[in-house]
């Protein structure tokens, strides 16, 4: 009596290598259900191997620093440079050595449906997390570039009260005036797991803030557009005017402010 397809599927779930002899054994089973299960498991293993390879590549900066003796590497990234409303948010995250979190990537590449799950995984595994928030008023005062640096420095400062202190900083496309060894990495959130961890923390934190603002200031779509200049947001500006969280140094908000001051 041949093994049931259900039993074969259960056996395949335990297989983790494409070289497992079970694959060769099942290749001669002509049942369509078996062949479908076989191909499905092979595809899943290939995806798992590709993910492992991707994560390993994203640890290259960290591994090089571990070899040099650094122990607590902090990744730093920001979210919210471009929106017309809301703060710029930066995060500083120290992960355990060689830590890999499945699905962790540049937050812009992670499906929104998976943001919260990966965010929670980072929170659970991180040795330390700091968050810096610079509001729209200070952004208008100092410009968004300087505000981004201030947010990053604030995120680092938050680690002072935590057990693990960074001895090296990996920063997404930015150099900070601080007495800690550092490296600026172009597209760092896609090339360093530490920076990617900071990216998702900053992203989820800011999205939560903008969702709260959406309840306070309805009509602009902040929960969906996070303050970016979408059609709904621009229509809201025309219909209701600017809010206390809009950046007055950003167009078209800037022009609206000028128009309102002219007779």
Curated annotation (Swiss-Prot):
InterPro entries: RNase_HII (IPR022898), RNase_HII/HIII (IPR001352), RNase_HII/HIII_dom (IPR024567), RNaseH-like_sf (IPR012337), RNaseH_sf (IPR036397). Belongs to the RNase HII family. It comes from the Bacteria. The keyword Metal-binding applies. A divalent metal cation binds at residues 77-78, 172. The lineage of its organism: Bacteria, Bacillati, Bacillota, Bacilli, Lactobacillales. Endonuclease that specifically degrades the RNA of RNA-DNA hybrids. Its cofactor is Mn(2+); Mg(2+). The keyword Manganese applies. This is Ribonuclease HII. Gene3D superfamilies: Ribonuclease H-like superfamily/Ribonuclease H. One of its GO terms (molecular function) is RNA binding. GO terms for cellular component: cytoplasm; ribonuclease H2 complex. CDD domains: RNase_HII_bacteria_HII_like. Residues 71-262 form the RNase H type-2 domain. Coiled coil: none annotated. It holds the Pfam family RNase_HII. Disulfide bonds: none annotated. It is found in: Cytoplasm. Signal peptide: none annotated. Manganese or magnesium. Binds 1 divalent metal ion per monomer in the absence of substrate. May bind a second metal ion after substrate binding. GO terms for biological process: DNA replication, removal of RNA primer; mismatch repair. Keywords: Cytoplasm, Endonuclease, Hydrolase, Manganese, Metal-binding, Nuclease. SUPFAM superfamilies: Ribonuclease H-like. Its EC number is 3.1.26.4. It catalyses: Endonucleolytic cleavage to 5'-phosphomonoester.
